[in-house]
Amino acid sequence: MDGWDVLAAIIWSILVFAALCAVGSIVVYVLHSISLYRGLSACGYVDPWMAWAPVLRQYALADCAVHGMDVVCVGRTPFPGWLFRFYWAICWALMLIPYGGWILSIALHVFAEGPCWAAMYGVVDGRDSKDEMLVGYLSAIVPIIPIVKLWNAGK
């Protein structure tokens, strides 16, 4: 076995790994979209089809959670409703900041999306959204949690 065979084996294994990652990502995206669609439908959101569009899904989740309110209280602190509806755009802008912008982006993502998931879980499960807050924040970090929580929503 010469050097070219080793190089070919390395390239082949990288391509197989990339293909498996791509297929896995597509499967998780489809399952996540199905679950989000079911959750939006169970909450009575008028446009649940937005769960399938890459950017619109974040807007639909936040808009469903905010319910047209101008001020949203997280804990006892009030925040403007547009912050939750357009947090994804602010996250993208924060990632343009060099040396730490991505940390701020991740923090805002978890801070803004966590209460949105908690509000949806509260409506779907018939509980107070404050009881679902921890699971909501974890859902903003681990995308498998919404798949499990919302798979049977609205059935």
Regions found by a protein language model. Give the residues of each.
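Active-site loop ensemble at the mouth of alpha/beta enzyme cores that anchors a bound cofactor
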Residues: 91-95
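Alpha-helical transmembrane segments
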Residues: 15-23
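Short, strongly hydrophobic alpha-helical membrane anchors
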Residues: 1-13
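Membrane-interface helix caps and helix-loop-helix hairpins in membrane proteins
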Residues: 96-103
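Membrane-interface extramembranous regions at the lipid-water interface
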Residues: 3-6, 24-90, 108-155
